Design a protein with these regions (language model features):
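C-terminal accessory segments of proteins
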Residues: 1-369
Length: 369
């Protein structure tokens, strides 16, 4: 997004300008429109992210749940080490400022505290009507802007600091959470308020508060906890050992995701067994508590070896992900001293194990939420 020109509607500079300068200050910070306008704004930002990479989801910075100091660690360093081993600029550290250069924050931001804002946020959550909730939440929202400092401290330039979007995602999350216990419709003045410059899909009509009343209308929900194990590749043993401490957390679902960008040369049933390193092609699946599920891979089966390049061409250059839910299999690892292993057994149509080289996976990920 940073590299796209200002003339591109999905460019960072274009979207950042909608909040303040150089656009005519579209943002709403009064009533009606504060929460609804910013929800529409975040939706536009998320759509722009997806146009570049559909796997990206805008995260939120939860400054509202307890004592915190400084901005999130992911936003503190100017560089980070990419998974490929290269040190690259951190896009969450700063953004391109209006007029040139990079955005900045308060010099002592790493020692500034935000814990008291959690109390104010909880007070806001206790309001029984929308107007009171919106008014109460606006205060700590503004305090975060001020304490981050630098470009974030003024409406005109706040949108140019990437942390703006993490901050407002949390404001939006708090509203969504409040709505769960207060499902009444928005006041009429909020529902009919036009959210300039955001338009309804395939329409010349501006969106209104009624179009963003719930996150479901926009196709997303907030999770209390969401955690990714960094992508890993298969070894010759087909067994992945994971630190059990990572799983001693409260969770609702656990999904294993296979990322791929190429066709498979072989058709296979890639079976996943949890904490059963001895599982093989003959291990039963039905009624087996260690069986997490399987990835059904439909391969070329052309009777000859295919090069990696040919398999990628065969996929049409598209990426695809397959996932299975292994939540039930992870219930037993809460016990102290337990370890977790994932044994991936590729079984061909003939019932025999398929060599690991034929598995068309770029990487695997484990998602807990």
């Amino acid at each position: 997004m940073y590299l796209l020109p200002a003339s591109n509607g999905n460019g960072f500079a274009t979207l950042a300008g909608l909040h303040g300068l150089p656009s005519p200050f579209y943002c709403e910070h009064g009533y009606p429109g504060f929460l609804t306008w910013h929800r529409a704004y975040l939706d536009a930002f998320q759509d722009a992210l997806c146009c570049i990479n559909s796997d990206v989801v805008l995260p939120y910075w939860d400054w509202s749940s307890g004592p915190t100091t400084g901005v999130p660690p992911a936003c503190r360093q100017p560089t980070y080490v990419h998974r490929n081993g290269n040190t690259v600029p951190n896009p969450l550290y700063s953004g391109p400022a209006l007029g040139g250069g990079q955005t900045n924050r308060a010099a002592d931001i790493d020692t500034r505290t935000f814990g008291d804002l959690a109390t104010f946020a909880q007070t806001a959550m206790g309001n029984s009507n929308f107007s009171g909730f919106q008014s109460s939440l606006n205060g700590p929202h503004g305090s975060v802007h001020g304490r981050v400092g630098g470009h974030m401290s003024g409406v005109a330039n706040a949108g140019y600091d990437p942390i703006f979007y993490l901050h407002h995602a949390n404001v939006d999350r708090l509203w969504a959470k409040w709505q769960q216990s207060h499902p009444a419709p928005l006041p009429s003045s909020e529902r009919t308020k036009e959210l300039d410059p955001f338009y309804k899909t395939f329409s010349t009509d501006l969106m209104t508060g009624a179009d963003v009343e719930t996150t479901d209308q926009l196709g997303y929900r907030y999770s209390t906890f969401c955690w990714f194990l960094p992508p890993f590749v298969l070894t010759d043993l087909l067994v992945v050992k994971l630190d059990p401490d990572w799983f001693r957390i409260r969770r609702t679902t656990a999904k294993l995701i296979m990322n791929s960008s190429k066709m498979s040369s072989r058709t296979m049933d890639l079976r996943v067994f949890v904490n059963d390193s001895r599982a093989d092609s003959g291990t039963k699946t039905l009624g087996n508590p260690a069986f997490g599920g399987s990835f059904g891979v439909f391969g070329m089966e052309v009777g000859e070896e295919m090069s990696d390049k040919a398999m990628r061409v065969g996929s049409g250059g598209q990426k695809f992900d397959l996932e299975i839910d292994i939540s039930d299999c992870l219930e037993h690892i809460d016990a102290d001293g337990d370890e977790l292993s994932l044994n991936l057994v590729p079984v061909g149509p003939d019932g025999k194990v398929v060599p690991i080289k034929h598995i068309p996976a770029d990487s695997f990920e484990l998602l807990l939420k």
